[in-house]
């Protein structure tokens, strides 16, 4: 049975994923499936760099604004929702395009991980807790950074209990799979967008400034007023830096600087993760104009999907 064709656009924040995905959707009659762990939450728009109505240019986007910030969202749940969206898109004769930066979520979509409930591994938990005592909290947190940078960015190193739990999930999953080497669920073409560090960091700094001007502080104030302060969602980069400013603990300049710093560090970890976890086509989005970089992607997608006779 022929697998469903899917295009996947991944990369660090501010590299140009959103624009690339939309241009491909316009060219190939596609729809976007968001692969971002924060954009699923309603009201978390500016801090997650959620696509605006103007930016979307009429292209449908899926898995955005599907739950509240205090709702649970696991990898298994995301996999189920994303695959349902992809199946629906393809059934209507459209091209599914996954766009995002949450590598663990995207891998769960692309590969045949079959999730079942997993009991707590007490031996593993004891070993991780022992490592925290012997090597220290920072060292334990660094292990999580290497395995799951997205999750690590939401947990403070001093919160050993949550670091240990996150490591358990990263090493075993909330669930277990029936295959240690899962097969590919889709016939996909994956592109990793990247740029030289200096160029990428400059874009990140500019994006943060634009987010602050667009009302990120006011967005965080609204979320706090709605009672979401202590939710997992509010520990995401873009929100955890602004909360101390809103609460009068740090200055606005300090909050802005922290957000830039954390976003740059996260982008570096994302690229490292993509390099080790995805076998894709790397596209430099910094040295050439967007048009030239996009044309390389367009030409590849056009050739790849000729065999499906979709276009």
UniProtKB/Swiss-Prot annotation:
It catalyses: adenosine(37) in tRNA + dimethylallyl diphosphate = N(6)-dimethylallyladenosine(37) in tRNA + diphosphate. The record marks 102, 125 as: Interaction with substrate tRNA. Residues 36-39 are annotated as: Interaction with substrate tRNA. It is an enzyme of class 2 (transferase). ATP binds at residues 11-18. GO terms for biological process: tRNA modification. Substrate binds at residues 13-18. Signal peptide: none annotated. Its EC number is 2.5.1.75. Its cofactor is Mg(2+). Keywords: ATP-binding, Magnesium, Nucleotide-binding, Transferase, tRNA processing. InterPro entries: Dimethylallyltransferase, IPT, P-loop_NTPase. It comes from the Bacteria. GO terms for molecular function: ATP binding; tRNA dimethylallyltransferase activity. Belongs to the IPP transferase family. HAMAP family: IPP_trans. Monomer. Catalyzes the transfer of a dimethylallyl group onto the adenine at position 37 in tRNAs that read codons beginning with uridine, leading to the formation of N6-(dimethylallyl)adenosine (i(6)A). This is tRNA dimethylallyltransferase. The gene is miaA.
